[in-house]
């Protein structure tokens, strides 16, 4: 390593900046026309900023709160379940600048450094915590979609990560990336921006369609939009002795769960198992991870909620055998079965083609309809897009330290038969359309990043 590299990096002697690929990226970009990023942004603190730690006061009533985004939820596809930060605090002088605006670039700046998201139209009015750095591009100087694609590329990510400091919890600050060189790529910038914007629009449209599907189930079945503000609330109730022969825990018989069951019965509900829905859970086994060519893509219960679906690791093929109880199929309903109630447990994801063939973690339940009268999109919409479905899933949680959803209890949940077959197919079509849009969104974003990388490699031509 030449000593000039040390000089150019503030005489840093830790190995991070020199082994991450940042130096090579800077050397390549030095041969091109570039502009420091701070000259391409505008707004609070020059357009690149995070915040200071603050006391978080959460509320339950949406009228008095704003959705609050954290580093753990930044990359999720569905932001409708975010916690609510006090609106009074959020709109104060101290925190008002943490509001997210469309076309901002959001970067995690503490812990896992350099995870990024492009602020979509449905993120307007959401506040973020202090560990998410915001980059606000100046539209008169640069296209926001292009800048995002560049920062996500194999040239941008290493340079962002190279500025990290801290031995235990790593951080970056705005000044560490302010002078990051941004190459000017001519027409490719507009093309990359268009791809990123189309990807964002497809993601927003997908969310609207899923919301429409859930509302349709509620309307047809006469369900309220919201049964309770949380999965578990402090309350008291009574239950028939015949109903406590299998479950004696009070949370299973809480009044919200009882109400959810009652209105499902009123909608002529029958058990999922009687409706031809099969359930699968992966065996608990020693997990040996290998290179891609020797393994099957593996995903955890946290990974299924991500906007971008990619293998986290590859599970050794020989461990899986010929039995495919571990396999995710397209159109499965995936339910997170472990965790704390109020978190991801009981939340579900629609398996579009991106997840087909993945090996599922033992912490994921897979529900697979086999009866055409109950199409997969309808099953997903009832369980995962209505509060009634969620409350019925959450009530089945058992265990004191780390609750889990028993598969047999989940298959006993009643699904409404009130919707006519044509209405069920309509809901099914909506869910499938939403899945295709999410797949399209990911494909467009990958294309944009590849376009930027290819243009840089060709010298900006």
Residue ranges and their predicted role:
Residues 98, 102-105, 129, 142, ...:
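Elongated alpha-helical scaffolds
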């Amino acid at each position: 390593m030449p000593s000039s590299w040390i000089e150019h990096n503030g005489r840093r002697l830790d190995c991070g900046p020199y082994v991450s690929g940042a130096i090579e990226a800077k050397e390549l970009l030095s041969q091109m026309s570039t502009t420091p990023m701070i000259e391409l942004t505008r707004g609070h603190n020059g357009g690149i900023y995070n915040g200071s730690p603050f006391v978080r006061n959460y509320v339950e009533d949406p009228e008095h709160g704003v959705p609050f985004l954290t580093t753990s939820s930044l990359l999720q596809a569905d932001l409708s379940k975010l916690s609510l930060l006090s609106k009074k605090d959020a709109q104060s002088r101290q925190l008002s600048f943490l509001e997210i605006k469309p076309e901002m670039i959001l970067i995690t700046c503490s812990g896992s450094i350099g995870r990024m998201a492009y602020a979509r139209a449905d993120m307007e009015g959401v506040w973020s915590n202090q560990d998410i750095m915001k980059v606000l591009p100046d539209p008169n100087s640069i296209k926001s979609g292009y800048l995002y694609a560049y920062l996500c590329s194999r040239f941008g990510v290493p340079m962002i990560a190279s500025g990290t400091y801290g031995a235990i919890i790593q951080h970056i600050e705005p000044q560490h990336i302010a002078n990051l060189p941004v190459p000017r790529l001519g027409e490719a910038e507009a093309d990359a921006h268009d791809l990123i914007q189309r990807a964002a629009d497809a993601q927003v449209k997908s969310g609207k369609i899923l919301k429409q599907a859930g509302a349709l189930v509620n309307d047809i079945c006469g369900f309220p939009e919201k049964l309770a503000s949380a999965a578990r609330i402090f309350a008291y109730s009574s239950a028939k002795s015949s109903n406590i022969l299998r479950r004696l825990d009070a949370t299973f018989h809480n009044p919200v769960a009882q109400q959810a069951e009652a209105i499902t019965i009123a909608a002529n509900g029958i058990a999922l198992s009687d409706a031809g829905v099969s359930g699968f859970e992966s065996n608990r086994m020693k997990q040996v991870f290998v290179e891609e060519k020797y393994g099957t893509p593996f995903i955890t219960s946290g990974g299924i909620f991500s906007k971008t679906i990619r293998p986290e690791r590859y599970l050794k093929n020989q461990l899986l055998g010929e039995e495919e109880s571990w396999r995710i199929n397209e159109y499965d309903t995936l339910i997170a079965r472990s965790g704390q109630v109020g978190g991801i447990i009981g939340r579900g994801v629609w398996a579009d083609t991106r997840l087909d063939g993945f090996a599922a973690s033992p912490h994921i339940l897979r529900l697979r309809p086999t009866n055409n009268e109950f199409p997969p999109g309808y099953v997903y919409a009832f369980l995962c897009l209505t509060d009634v479905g969620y409350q019925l899933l959450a009530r089945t949680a058992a265990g004191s330290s780390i609750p889990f959803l028993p598969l047999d209890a989940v298959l006993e949940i009643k699904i409404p038969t009130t919707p006519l077959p044509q209405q069920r197919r309509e809901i099914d079509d909506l869910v499938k359309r939403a899945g295709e849009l999410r797949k399209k969104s990911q494909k467009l974003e990958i294309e944009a990043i590849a376009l930027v990388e290819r243009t840089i490699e060709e010298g900006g031509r």
